[in-house]
């Protein structure tokens, strides 16, 4: 006698759901931060809730707490991910290579404007301006470990150019941060307008280079 397969024949009986696959922690954290970026950008830090981030990730609130202790913790981790490293310096200069304005443009100015084409750079700036004070450690760490060493490298280039006679001593050589000022102005303009228009960026870059030529050419 052949037995009937009741579960297969009965329309009211469904197949058991496969067990939910556990993702690696690093993958889950990435998903949470991706969702948090959209939630914080849409609602702002103050109005965003952990429930919103959990829902956007497809997790329970407890699932989010497995990886982050608070909304502030998520925000700090997000800023650390978004704040881009300063563009890496090219190969060291040869001992006899002159430091000219053209060299500064290729090593400092051009990489800066190229980075503005990355949407995550503008997202990071918007979050920093709106709520950066809520996660000062993230910004301080970036400033100390990435920005300050970059400025120190620029300062050495400027002083070498002055000593070689290929750059003129000016406010920029005395305060190297000023070499970035037009680019920072351009970046803030993009944040206000909501996008980095290529034509506008090209115009800003041309003005930036013209300023350096006027202030640094002997």
Per-range role (PLM):
Residues 77, 91-123, 173-179, 205:
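Hydrophobic alpha-helical connector segments
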Residues 1-43, 47-59, 66-73, 99:
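Basic, helix-initiating cap at the start of DNA-binding domains
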Residues 140, 144, 148, 159-211:
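Hydrophobic/aromatic-rich alpha-helical bundle segments in the mid-to-C-terminal region
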Residues 35, 39, 111, 182-189:
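Amphipathic alpha-helical interface segments
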Residues 116-144, 188-193:
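Amphipathic alpha-helical segments used for helix-helix packing
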Residues 80-86:
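Short, basic, alpha-helical segments at the C-terminal edge of helix-turn-helix-like DNA-binding modules
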Residues 39, 115, 153, 157:
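Short alpha-helical functional segments enriched in proximate histidine and acidic residues
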Residues 112, 125-129, 179-183, 212:
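Short alpha-helical scaffolding segments that buttress acidic/His motifs in well-ordered protein cores
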């Amino acid at each position: 006698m052949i037995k009937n397969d009741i579960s297969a024949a009965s329309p009211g009986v469904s197949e058991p759901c496969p067990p939910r696959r556990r993702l690696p922690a690093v993958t889950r954290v990435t998903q949470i931060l991706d969702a948090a970026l959209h939630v914080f950008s849409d609602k702002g830090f103050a109005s965003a809730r952990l429930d919103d981030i959990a829902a956007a990730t497809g997790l329970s609130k407890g699932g989010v707490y497995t990886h982050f202790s608070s909304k502030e913790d998520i925000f700090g981790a997000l800023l650390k991910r978004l704040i881009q490293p300063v563009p890496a310096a090219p190969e060291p200069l040869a001992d006899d290579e002159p430091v000219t304005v053209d060299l500064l443009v290729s090593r400092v100015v051009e990489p800066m404007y190229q980075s503005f084409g990355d949407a995550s750079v503008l997202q990071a700036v918007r979050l920093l301006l709106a709520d950066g004070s809520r996660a000062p450690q993230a910004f301080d760490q970036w400033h100390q470990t990435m920005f300050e060493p970059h400025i120190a490298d620029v300062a050495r280039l400027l002083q070498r150019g002055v000593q070689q006679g290929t750059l003129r001593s000016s406010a920029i050589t005395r305060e190297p941060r000023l070499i970035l000022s037009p680019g920072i102005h351009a970046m803030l303009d993009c944040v206000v307008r909501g996008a980095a228009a290529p034509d506008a960026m090209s115009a800003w870059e041309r003005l930036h280079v013209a300023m350096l030529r006027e202030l640094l050419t002997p």
